């Protein structure tokens, strides 16, 4: 995540404040994070995404639709505090003799989608939100990719963590996201209608719960009144 860590942290906290304003959530990178290796009380969420890379030795550029982004989440109800650890797996140049593993670069749009997906998963797993999970939205790619995934130069593949290819969506040229984005993750998100606030599901769930409580109170009052009148 390099120098973009603060961007991820800020965007994540803003999204969490929209749905859980009284709870404190933090996000931090952890290069030692491994899939399916969880501490007690922790949960996992993985996304395979589209991103760009640049070799620090020869300046060669390439793109991949199979970049693994790993999240581990933990929620303490007693402290009203949650934490997320994040790892973005790297790739290396296939042309250089001794290449370094490079961090991926992501568009702002895909960063936002990744984090929205993450928040949905937190609501589902940590708060047991009673909304229906929809399918994750394919990541946006700004170029066409040809050929198989280069597993020999993929950090996740070399460590045995890579999965099959993911579905990505190409944008028309007029809607192509900026290539030089601030961050570096991409994911699979859930499809929500254009202009619809992704967190309206959580808000609707909260309203329905409050309405149910109100109805129960009204019914209880009516029963008490009837009992009192009958007794008189």
Swiss-Prot record:
<dbReference type="GO" id="GO:0005737">
    <property type="term" value="C:cytoplasm"/>
</dbReference>
<feature type="topological domain" description="Cytoplasmic">
    <location>
        <begin position="1"/>
        <end position="211"/>
    </location>
</feature>
<keyword id="KW-0472">Membrane</keyword>
<protein>
    <recommendedName>
        <fullName>Receptor-transporting protein 3</fullName>
    </recommendedName>
</protein>
<keyword id="KW-0479">Metal-binding</keyword>
<dbReference type="GO" id="GO:0008270">
    <property type="term" value="F:zinc ion binding"/>
</dbReference>
<dbReference type="InterPro" id="IPR027377">
    <property type="entry name" value="ZAR1/RTP1-5-like_Znf-3CxxC"/>
</dbReference>
<comment type="subunit">
    <text>Interacts with TAS2R16.</text>
</comment>
<feature type="transmembrane region" description="Helical">
    <location>
        <begin position="212"/>
        <end position="232"/>
    </location>
</feature>
<dbReference type="GO" id="GO:0031849">
    <property type="term" value="F:olfactory receptor binding"/>
</dbReference>
<dbReference type="GO" id="GO:0016020">
    <property type="term" value="C:membrane"/>
</dbReference>
<dbReference type="GO" id="GO:0051205">
    <property type="term" value="P:protein insertion into membrane"/>
</dbReference>
<dbReference type="InterPro" id="IPR026096">
    <property type="entry name" value="R-trans_p"/>
</dbReference>
<dbReference type="Pfam" id="PF13695">
    <property type="entry name" value="Zn_ribbon_3CxxC"/>
</dbReference>
<comment type="function">
    <text>Promotes functional cell surface expression of the bitter taste receptors TAS2R16 and TAS2R43.</text>
</comment>
<comment type="similarity">
    <text>Belongs to the TMEM7 family.</text>
</comment>
<keyword id="KW-0812">Transmembrane</keyword>
<keyword id="KW-1133">Transmembrane helix</keyword>
<keyword id="KW-0862">Zinc</keyword>
<dbReference type="GO" id="GO:0006612">
    <property type="term" value="P:protein targeting to membrane"/>
</dbReference>
<dbReference type="GO" id="GO:0001580">
    <property type="term" value="P:detection of chemical stimulus involved in sensory perception of bitter taste"/>
</dbReference>
<keyword id="KW-0863">Zinc-finger</keyword>
<feature type="zinc finger region" description="3CxxC-type">
    <location>
        <begin position="49"/>
        <end position="160"/>
    </location>
</feature>
